[in-house]
């Protein structure tokens, strides 16, 4: 073999068992590497890179890195680096080197060396040097194969054993099968290959190339792969390649026990350049049948596959695991990145990455910390499928564990057609699939304008009849900003969970972000794993695994294997594996992928997905989904985190720090831990924990606990704990505890917006507590619903109402102004549709708590139903399109304005309800309240309406609970005081007794409104509106059933009797003898008068007129001199056609 080029159609078989072919060593070469093919000699390069293929001459090289083109002054431990210019002072220990010039002064222990020209001053320990030059045709490179039959061939202790096979241009039908192991009935353990890289640069004009690398396809074999520390694989494929198959690190064994362990810092780099057709990149696949395959210990094993423009029908199937009847364990892949940048004009591209589709197998994926996948895809894609991190096993026990800091970045630019982004999917059938321990595993997919038929299916999990547990996804964001117009038929299906007959456990995904900013951030200090700067970075300290600068960075200390900066970020400290900022300055980001369009300033972001279009100012988000969606597209379905399990056994646990936050504008001075942020305008100083936020106008001082928030203007200084928050106009200082509060304004035709749905059947544990209420729809649920129940005729069989103000399941105003718009919000099984082609389906709670909010329609007719068992989910349909007040910055206290704007008034009623809840919480903990707290936590932007909101809220809690607020000092500090005192009538005088007296007045008022009696069902239905439920202790009233049926009956305030001829027995309440006293009647009248003043303006005038009529009748009774006569006349004359008794 000598110094000549490899012959055409040659097959070098390297390092096979029972055969050795040592060559004469060159002079001065000290090599321990089995294969070295340098193309040129780098000079004085001091690196630890495993793969090195310099194109220029280097001197004095001491290399342990097989592939390296280092910049000047760079100290890197990255396994893969390909500089464009010749480095100087290269000192490498790379086992594989391919130089075209003769090395001088080489001390070599390599048994085989084939170099074209001697490099000078190179100190190499590579045992094998084999340059394969251009014009290969039908070449088979079968390297490190082990195919014995009935043999025990142990491969052990190959430290620094590199393989470098540069394949140049004009190669046709080339098969590169590397590190394969296909023995039959064999026990072949592969152990101890530290720093064993594989470098296969493949240049232009390839046709039907198969790159099958690190495959393991034994049959009936026990094959153990262990200890491949720093074993990178680099396969740069240049333009005009057709029908290329890159099948890397595959494992296709049948009836085999194959164990892959200890691949520390084993990177795989496959840059694929433009004009590809029908390319298949199948990386790190594991598809054994009836096999026990264990993949363990691949720390810092990156895979980089940059694919450039004009590729057609490309399949990137990466890190797949599709065994059948197999026990496949993937463990310990820290910092194992996969980078696949793809440029413009792709057609029919399939990116199937990190898939796991075994059948009847036990597949365990564990320990992949810092294993990023980067696939930047540029414009003019057609029919692209990005299927990433999928797990679709059938009848399989698949466990995914320990993938900290494993980002996936797929930036895709404009003019996409028929693109499918199916990412992090898990759709196993009859499988036990456990996803655990993916901290800081980001996925970044920036998708820009002019999309057509794009499917973004991200982090889906769709099991049926499954035990699906979603645990521990703190800061696991997905940010997919979809930019300006001409998007057609876009589906955003995020965080879905729909497996069939599967036990799927998702655990421990802390800080797993997906960030796709579209503009450059300024002053950003980022730990984001993927960032692309367009120019030279200066003094960057990067731990990110992929770093490919176009020009040599100066004074750079890089631990990341791949780094491609385009512009110099200044003062950047990056721990993220992929870092491609356009021009961020001083960014400190923990999100793995960051693609900002405009510079956020002073941003400290831990959110994985970040798509700001303009800066957010002073916002602190803890809500899981905050995104005002303004999509100007046609036929766009948007499906947000759905959960469709049937017979699911366990619900999601804990209020995780919200998954989706998508601001469309860059934030300034933002400290963000939220995964998705895409505001259109700039919130300043935002501290966000919320995963999805797409505000359109700024919110100021909002504190939101609601789960869905889509404001149209950017929120400012917002503190949100809610997962979804979609207000139409900016609230100020809001404190949302409702899980879904979202006015959705969609300006599109035929748009479907599906927001977090939950269709479980037979759930075992319903949501509990105030913070776990899935949907809170503030239709002034305290007093509005109470009043509606008071003013309606009694119902026959209402369900037991929901409990507590904080557990009201629906609080979400939805305002949709498109034609043919479907808004499906947190639905259970029933789905209701409504006229005007607008469907707003809002969730029902548990069977005991079907509904807690009245339904209001601002059309011609108003329906307030008692919500019996047959009643559907509450629907709020708005036909008014006057939402300018919602975005107005100049809010004034105008009652006439409130009267004329029902939608705006509805929002003020929400504020009244929220403030009342906030005051009750303060009352329970016995703390005073200040005006500043109310403005900051609830009122937010509505400071001009604070007097109206505060007056109604304090009147409401005084009416229903007998609790008033008194100002105690000039700084607007208030304390709570009980106001009801019936001691003269023999009532209790202690604090609880006073509150119970107020409840008694309420019940007597209900009976009075109904006539002479009220059924037990009506009483409990009204009380449920204020959180008082039978059999459950209340903070102010105690146990209410005992009060109503025993205590007050014994004290003769109430009469409790059975309805005659009722089967099953039904009961009703009447006034007792002591209730007819002067004091009690006067209290009832005062209560009704105060209740009339707190009636929401949105209620029709007929209800206010009815309440006024009741008040006048009661006042007439009080004014009558003869008390007994007045009582008799009241019982006979208070009846009206609209309020007939049962």
Curated annotation (Swiss-Prot):
Pfam families: MAGE. Keywords: Cytoplasm, Phosphoprotein, Repeat, Tumor antigen. The modification Phosphoserine is found at residues 63, 207, 382, 1063. Signal peptide: none annotated. Residues 13-42, 76-87, 627-659, 741-762, 807-889, 1123-1142 have a biased composition (Low complexity). Residues 1-132, 502-778, 791-893, 1118-1142 are annotated as: Disordered. Expressed in testis and in tumors of a wide variety of histologic types. InterPro entries: MAGE (IPR037445), MAGE_WH1 (IPR041898), MAGE_WH2 (IPR041899), MHD_dom (IPR002190). GO terms for cellular component: cytoplasm; nucleus. Its main location: cytoplasm. One of its GO terms (biological process) is negative regulation of transcription by RNA polymerase II. This is Melanoma-associated antigen C1. It comes from Homo sapiens.
């Amino acid at each position: 073999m000598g110094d000549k080029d490899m012959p055409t159609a040659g097959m070098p078989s390297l390092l096979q068992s029972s055969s050795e072919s040592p060559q004469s060593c060159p002079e001065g070469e000290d090599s321990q590497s089995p294969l070295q093919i340098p193309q040129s000699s780098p000079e004085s390069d001091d690196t630890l890179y495993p793969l090195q293929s310099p194109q220029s001459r280097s001197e004095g090289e001491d290399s342990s890195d097989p592939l390296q083109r280092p910049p000047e002054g760079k100290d890197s431990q990255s396994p893969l680096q390909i500089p464009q210019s010749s480095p100087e002072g290269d000192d490498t220990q790379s086992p594989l080197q391919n130089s075209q010039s003769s090395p001088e002064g080489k001390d070599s222990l390599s048994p085989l060396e084939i170099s074209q020209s001697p490099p000078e001053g190179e100190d190499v320990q590579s045992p094998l040097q084999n340059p394969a030059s251009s014009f290969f045709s039908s070449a088979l490179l079968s390297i490190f194969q082990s195919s014995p039959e009935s043999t025990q061939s142990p491969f052990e202790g190959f430290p620094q054993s590199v393989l470098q096979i540069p394949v140049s241009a004009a190669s046709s039908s080339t098969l590169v099968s590397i590190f394969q192991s296909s023995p039959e009935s064999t026990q072949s353990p592969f152990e101890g290959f530290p720093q064993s890289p594989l470098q296969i640069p493949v240049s232009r004009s390839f046709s039907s190339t198969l790159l099958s690398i690190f495959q393991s396809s034994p049959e009936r074999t026990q094959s153990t792969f262990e200890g491949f520390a720093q074993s990178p694989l680099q396969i740069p494929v240049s333009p005009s390649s057709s029908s290329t198959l890159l099948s890397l690190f595959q494992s296709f064994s049948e009836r085999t026990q194959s164990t892959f362990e200890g691949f520390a810092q084993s990177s795989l780099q496959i840059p694929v350049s433009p004009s590809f057709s029908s390319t298949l990149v199948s990386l790190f696949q594991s598809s054994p049948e009836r096999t026990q395959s264990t993949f363990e210990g691949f720390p810092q094993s990156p895979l980089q596959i940059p694919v450039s423009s004009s590729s057609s029908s490309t399949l990137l199937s990466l890190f797949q695991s599709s065994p059948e009847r197999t026990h496949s364990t993937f463990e310990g892949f820290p910092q194992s990145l996969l980078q696949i940048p793809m440029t413009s004009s792709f057609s029919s591209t399939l990116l199937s990455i990190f898939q796991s589709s075994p059948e009847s197998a036990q597949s365990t994926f564990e320990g992949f910390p810092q294993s990023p996948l980067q696939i930047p895809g540029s414009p003019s894609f057609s029919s692209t499928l990005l299927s990433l991190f999928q797990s679709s096993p059938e009848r399989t026990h698949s466990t995914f564990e320990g993938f900290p800091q494993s980002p996936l970045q797929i930036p895709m630019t404009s003019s996409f057609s028929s693109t499918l982004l199916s990412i992090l999917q898990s759709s196993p059938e009859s499988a036990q699939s456990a996803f655990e321990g993916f901290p800081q595993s980001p996925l970044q997919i920036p998708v820009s304008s002019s999309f057509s038929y794009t499917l973004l299916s991200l982090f889906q999990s769709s099991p049926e009849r499954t035990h699906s547990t979603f645990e521990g996804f703190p800061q696991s964001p997905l940010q997919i900003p979809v930019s300006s117009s001409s998007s057609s038929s876009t589906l955003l299906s995020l965080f879905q969970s729909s497996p069939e007959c599967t036990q799927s456990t998702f655990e421990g995904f802390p800080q797993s972000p997906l960030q796709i900013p579209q503009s450059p951030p300024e002053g950003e200090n980022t730990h984001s794993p993927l960032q692309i700067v367009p120019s030279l970075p200066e003094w960057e300290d990067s731990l990110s695994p992929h770093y490919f600068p176009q020009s040599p960075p100066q004074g750079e200390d890089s631990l990341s294997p791949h780094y491609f900066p385009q512009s110099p970020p200044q003062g950047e400290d990056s721990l993220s594996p992929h870092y491609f900022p356009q021009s961020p300055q001083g960014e400190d980001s923990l999100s793995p992928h960051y693609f900002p369009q405009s510079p956020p300033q002073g941003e400290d972001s831990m959110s994985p997905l970040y798509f700001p279009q303009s800066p957010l100012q002073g916002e602190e988000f803890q809500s899981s989904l905050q995104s005002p969606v303004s999509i100007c597209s046609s036929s766009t379905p948007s499906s947000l985190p759905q959960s469709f399990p049937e017979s699911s056994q366990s619900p999601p646990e804990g209020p995780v720090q919200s998954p989706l936050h998508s601001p469309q504008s860059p934030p300034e001075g933002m400290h963000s831990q939220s995964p998705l942020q895409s505001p259109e305008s700039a919130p300043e100083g935002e501290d966000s924990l919320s995963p999805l936020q797409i505000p359109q106008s700024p919110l100021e001082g909002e504190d939101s606990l609601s789960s869905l928030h889509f404001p149209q203007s950017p929120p400012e200084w917002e503190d949100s704990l809610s997962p979804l928050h979609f207000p139409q106009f900016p609230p100020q200082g809001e404190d949302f505890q409702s899980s879904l509060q979202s006015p959705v304004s969609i300006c599109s035709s035929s748009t479907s917006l599906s927001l977090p749905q939950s269709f479980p059947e037979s759930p075992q544990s319903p949501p509990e507590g105030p913070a776990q209420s899935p949907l809170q729809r503030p239709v002034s649920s305290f007093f509005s619903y109470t009043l509606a129940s008071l003013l309606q005729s009694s119902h026959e069989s209402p369900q037991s109402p929901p409990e507590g103000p904080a557990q009201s399941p629906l609080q979400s105003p939805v305002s949709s102004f498109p034609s043919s718009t479907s808004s499906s919000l947190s639905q259970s099984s029933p789905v209701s549709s409504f006229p005007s082609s607008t469907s707003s389906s809002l969730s029902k709670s548990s069977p005991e708590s079907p509904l807690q909010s009245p339904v209001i329609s601002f059309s011609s007719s108003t329906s307030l139903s008692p919500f019996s068992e047959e009643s559907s989910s509450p629907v709020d349909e708005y036909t008014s399109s006057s939402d300018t007040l919602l975005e107005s910055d100049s809010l004034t206290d105008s009652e006439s304005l409130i009267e004329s704007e029902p939608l705006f008034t509805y929002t003020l009623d929400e504020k009244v309800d929220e403030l009342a809840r906030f005051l009750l919480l303060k009352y329970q903990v016995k703390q005073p309240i200040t005006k500043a707290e109310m403005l900051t936590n609830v009122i937010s932007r509505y400071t001009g309406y604070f007097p109206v909101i505060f007056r109604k809220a304090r009147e409401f809690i005084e009416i229903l609970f007998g609790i008033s607020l008194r100002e105690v000092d000039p700084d607007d500090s208030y304390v709570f005081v009980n106001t009801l005192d019936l001691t003269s009538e023999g009532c209790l005088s202690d604090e609880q007794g006073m509150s119970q007296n107020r409840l008694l007045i309420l019940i007597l008022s209900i009976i009075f409104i109904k006539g002479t009696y009220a059924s037990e069902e009506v009483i409990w239905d009204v009380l449920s509106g204020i959180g008082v439920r039978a059999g459950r202790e209340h903070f102010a009233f105690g146990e209410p059933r005992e009060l109503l049926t025993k205590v007050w009956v014994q004290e003769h305030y109430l009469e409790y009797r059975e309805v005659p001829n009722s089967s099953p027995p039904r009961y009703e309440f009447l006034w007792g003898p002591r209730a007819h006293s002067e004091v009690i009647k006067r209290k009832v009248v005062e209560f009704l008068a105060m209740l009339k003043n707190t009636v929401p303006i949105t209620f029709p005038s007929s209800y206010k007129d009815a309440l006024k009529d009741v008040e006048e009748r009661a006042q007439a009774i009080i004014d009558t001199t003869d008390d007994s006569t007045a009582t008799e006349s009241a019982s006979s004359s208070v009846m009206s056609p609209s309020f007939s008794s049962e």
